[in-house]
């Protein structure tokens, strides 16, 4: 069965989802039938073909009127501003990937379904009333056919949750803190300009900028047992892609740094292969650009203090890794089937 997908929002994640689909060789499993984006077709085709972070797309891309051609594949282009006007029923859409970053609550999901989609996957955490939040590699096996409106969590949640699970299963986490060192995003300013968040009024290329984060809430959504036991802060740095996460946890069992690294390396080679990677090479952020893993543990930065405090550094390509997980979760949602009577 080929899953018929529509993409709502063709920004950073939407375009990377299309690129990842073609580069990963999964076109026999997923076909993109339509993209809804307010920008014009010429701009959509240009930004799919040429990308500052990920380079030129290997596939031929062109557009004619309201059709986007990727190789021999034809994708219908839509410019609908209202979810109710989207022709998902006419197009036989199985799963909508909503990559707008704007929509994300149950009402929005129901609007996609009322328009004819069978299921919806949001590319950000969304509201708490969704049917499920998936971090692929950790909890996708909890998906059921009746889960129609699903969140793929966030790039940072996908990065840190597998590592937290591994450390908790092995040593028992008591509490933790997380610092996200995140590349600049398009909600920041190129030069100083007005923004409701006064820190984000400042030029993104000239400062390390603290921002709010809901990562602690994202952790407890997946692992409710950590409610009030994790805190998170975030800063944006003047790079355009790749994120590092500094994770510190206190654990019940005494441990050595070498044992932590052995655990994480074994997981990367085994149960979490393709989701978690492990390196001890002297790499910097750009070396992880276009890496499809959710998390890459930097073993050179693992530290243990007092036998119970573990500090690790985990990298991720916050665009490419997450786009690949969107595809994984889409297939997992389709694999459990569709119940249209719910």
UniProtKB/Swiss-Prot annotation:
Catalytic site positions: 155
Keywords linked to the UniProt accession: Cytoplasm, NAD, Oxidoreductase, Pyridoxine biosynthesis
GO cellular component: cytoplasm
Single Gene Ontology MF annotation: erythrose-4-phosphate dehydrogenase activity
Binding of NAD(+), residues: 12-13, 318
Residues annotated for substrate binding in this entry: 154-156, 200, 213-214, 236
One protein family per Pfam: Gp_dh_N
Family in the record: Belongs to the glyceraldehyde-3-phosphate dehydrogenase family. Epd subfamily.
Subunit structure: Homotetramer.
Protein name from the UniProt record: D-erythrose-4-phosphate dehydrogenase
Organism whose genome encodes this protein: Salmonella arizonae (strain ATCC BAA-731 / CDC346-86 / RSK2980)
């Amino acid at each position: 069965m080929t899953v018929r997908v529509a993409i709502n929002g063709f920004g950073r994640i939407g375009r990377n989802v299309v690129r990842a689909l073609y580069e990963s060789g999964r076109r026999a499993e997923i076909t993109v039938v339509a993209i809804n984006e307010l920008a014009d077709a010429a701009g959509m085709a240009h930004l799919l073909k040429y990308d500052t972070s990920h380079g030129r797309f290997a596939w031929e891309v062109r557009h004619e009127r309201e059709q986007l051609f990727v190789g021999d594949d034809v994708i219908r282009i839509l410019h609908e501003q209202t979810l109710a006007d989207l022709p998902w029923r006419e197009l036989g859409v199985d799963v909508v990937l909503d990559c707008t970053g704007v929509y994300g609550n149950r009402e929005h999901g129901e609007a996609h379904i009322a328009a004819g989609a069978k299921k919806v996957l949001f590319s950000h955490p969304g509201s708490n009333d969704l049917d499920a939040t998936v971090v692929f590699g950790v909890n996708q096996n909890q998906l059921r056919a009746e889960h129609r409106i699903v969140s793929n969590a966030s790039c940072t949640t996908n990065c840190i949750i597998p590592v937290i699970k591994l450390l908790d299963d092995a040593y028992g986490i008591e509490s933790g803190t997380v610092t996200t060192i995140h590349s600049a995003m398009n909600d920041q300013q190129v030069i100083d300009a007005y923004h409701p968040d006064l820190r984000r009024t400042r030029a993104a290329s000239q400062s390390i900028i603290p921002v709010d984060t809901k990562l602690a809430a994202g952790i407890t959504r997946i692992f409710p047992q950590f409610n009030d036991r994790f805190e998170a802060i975030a800063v944006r740095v003047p790079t355009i892609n790749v994120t590092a996460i500094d994770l510190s946890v206190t654990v019940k069992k005494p441990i050595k740094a070498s044992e932590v690294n052995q655990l994480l390396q074994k997981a990367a080679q085994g149960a979490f292969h393709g989701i978690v990677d492990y390196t001890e090479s002297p790499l910097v952020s750009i070396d992880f650009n276009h890496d499809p893993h959710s998390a890459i543990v930097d073993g050179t930065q693992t530290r243990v203090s007092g036998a119970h405090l573990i500090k690790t550094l985990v990298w991720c390509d916050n665009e490419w890794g997450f786009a690949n997980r969107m595809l994984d979760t889409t297939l997992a949602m389709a694999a459990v089937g569709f119940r249209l009577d719910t």
